[in-house]
From Swiss-Prot:
One of its GO terms (biological process) is protein refolding. ATP binds at residues 29-32, 86-90, 413, 478-480, 494. This is Chaperonin GroEL. Together with its co-chaperonin GroES, plays an essential role in assisting protein folding. The GroEL-GroES system forms a nano-cage that allows encapsulation of the non-native substrate proteins and provides a physical environment optimized to promote and accelerate protein folding. GO terms for molecular function: ATP binding; ATP-dependent protein folding chaperone; isomerase activity; unfolded protein binding.
Length: 547
């Protein structure tokens, strides 16, 4: 396909036009008084949101050159979302500011490669200063503040803090759509997996249709059990002790299942059989997790164990095992705590090493099941449009909270970025030429989030920026209450990871765009028209001949 090429200033200005169209759409959402953006959907109701990355993903521009610029900034938002889960609007705004100031200097004759060097030098200094002033968070109140600022809703912040308090920092917290109007928190303690009983005759509570066993033995195996003779020796040992049994196996069928059910109905022996969760290698890993949690040994031929020779000391135990039609929950397994910690560390290492998002998600689930439990935030609203918007805000707030727990917090409302300006200015003395220009570009860009938050609230951004710069570190502008306060004491905070990622990703893409000297796009070709339809069939000539 033929290409069209633009060079120099013309190419850069076309890219900048696309950057501005995307950034101007996104930046109106910044801050507590930021507005929403409505996005048309081909199917269903329009989406109303203030989530930067969601808005950016929807933008495709007609002009190919402008679209390239927009796609580059979209990458800033997407990368920040992937790394920190929030701060995408800030990242987009910083990218726009760096590109605007940078292109002015390139047009005036500055060398973009040297400017790029200055930009990276300044960003490194700013990030180092952010890390130095970062405060770690431990208390439930601090976690609630981070969530409340991100979602602009104190109730959401409190809900997330409650969830983290119950399942721990490594616990899984998921966000789901509720069928009711309210937003609620459901917590599942212990390990739960999505496999229920193999026969409804095994239930102990016929009203709730669930089997609840306290202090029962747990047999874990990767074998398919179809012959009762295989497990008869171990069953006899358990019956002698008068204990109940939970069997977790690849499958239990035929004679084996029928015998267990008949014995349960006769009152001879209480047992519930459950299929092992997962598939393939993931099933093996989950069986190992269950074994570690309950203190059992996985009875597997791969490990040299056979069901016929299994003994009671190979079985695990737990305070409670609850099995319903679809789920099995093991609470307070009696496994060795050190072995559980080692298993948790092993899974954390796998999470760090994996590149697959799907694998990462499944490993996170396993980690949560071993280390605490799962919390589900059920999001409710009056209409579907409000429900989608609220769900996106809660997901962002949850990501921001996790980031804050990981790397700590800094002053919010754009204050932290203004506070690191002196560290960037300190580099100016030892720099010269275009490298100095690159440092000054970052120095100016660091003001932009605070300026935009003020302007979205209908205030003069420059006045607010100058006042914050002349105040003590940590003093910022509380837009909602129209006063200057110590941001951290007032609970207006941002996660360090979010602020750092936004700046690093914005600088990375923007500096690359400044070094562009030509842009190449496909020439839009006219699509050939559809061929004409077939001619109509002629009518039948003459009438029927007379007999």
């Amino acid at each position: 396909m033929a290409k069209e090429i633009r060079f120099g200033e013309k190419a850069r200005r076309s890219l900048e036009a696309g950057v501005n169209k995307l950034a101007d759409t996104v930046k109106v959402t910044l801050g507590p008084k930021g507005r929403n953006v409505v996005i048309d959907k081909k199917f269903g109701s329009p989406l109303i949101t203030n989530d930067g990355v969601t808005i950016a993903r929807e933008i495709e521009l007609e002009d190919a050159y402008e679209n390239m610029g927009a796609q580059l900034v979209k990458e800033v938002a997407t990368k920040t979302n992937d790394v920190a889960g929030d701060g995408t609007t800030t990242a987009t705004l910083l990218a726009q500011a760096i590109i605007r100031e940078g292109l002015k200097n390139v047009a005036a004759g500055a060398n973009p490669m040297i400017i790029k060097k200055g930009i990276h030098k300044a960003v490194d200094a700013a990030v180092a200063e952010l890390k130095a002033v970062s405060k770690s968070i431990e208390s439930k109140e601090a976690i609630a503040q981070v969530g409340a600022i991100s979602a602009a809703d104190e109730e959401i912040g409190q809900l997330i803090a409650d969830a983290m308090d119950k399942v721990g920092k490594d616990g899984v917290i998921t966000v789901e759509e509720s069928k009711s109007m309210g937003t609620t928190l459901d917590v599942v303690e212990g390990m739960q997996f999505d496999r229920g009983y193999l026969s409804p005759y095994m239930v102990t509570d016929t009203e709730k249709m669930e089997a609840v066993f306290n202090d029962a033995y747990i047999l874990v195996t990767d074998k398919k059990i179809s012959n009762i003779q295989e497990i008869l020796p171990i069953l006899e040992q358990i019956v002698q002790q008068g204990k109940k049994l939970v069997i977790i196996a690849e499958d239990i069928e035929g004679e084996a299942l029928a015998t267990l059910v008949v014995n349960k109905l006769r009152g001879t022996f209480e047992c519930v059989a459950v299929k092992a969760p997962g598939f393939g290698d993931r099933r093996k890993s989950m069986l190992d997790d269950i074994a570690v949690l309950t203190g059992a040994t996985v009875i597997s031929e791969e490990l040299g164990y056979d069901l016929k020779t299994a003994t009671v000391d190979m079985l695990g135990t737990a305070r409670t095992v609850k099995v319903d039609k679809e789920n099995t929950t093991i609470v307070e397994g009696a496994g060795n705590q050190q072995l559980i910690k080692d298993r948790v560390s092993q899974i954390k290492k796998q999470i760090e090493e994996t590149t697959s998002d799907f694998d990462k998600e499944k490993l996170q689930e396993r980690l949560a099941k071993l280390s605490g439990g799962v919390a589900v935030i059920q999001v409710g609203a009056a209409t579907e449009t409000e429900l989608k918007e609220r769900k996106l805000r809660i997901e962002d707030a949850l990501n921001a909270t996790r980031a804050a727990v990981e790397e700590g917090i800094v002053a919010g409302g754009g204050t932290a970025l203004v506070n690191v300006i002196p560290a960037v200015e300190a580099l100016l003395e030892g720099s010269q030429g275009d490298e100095k220009t690159g440092i000054q570009i970052i120095r100016r860009a660091l003001e932009e989030p605070l300026r935009q938050i003020a302007e979205n609230a209908g205030l003069e951004g420059s006045v607010i920026v100058n006042k914050v710069m002349s105040s003590d570190k940590g003093i910022g502008y509380d837009v909602l209450n129209n006063k200057y306060v110590n941001m951290i004491e007032a609970g207006i905070v941002d996660p360090t990871k979010v602020t750092r990622s936004a700046l690093q990703n914005a600088a990375s893409i923007s500096a690359m765009l400044l070094t562009t000297e030509s842009a190449v796009v496909d020439i839009a070709s006219e699509e050939p028209g559809m061929p004409g339809g077939m001619g109509g069939m002629g009518g039948m000539g003459g009438g029927m001949p007379m007999m």
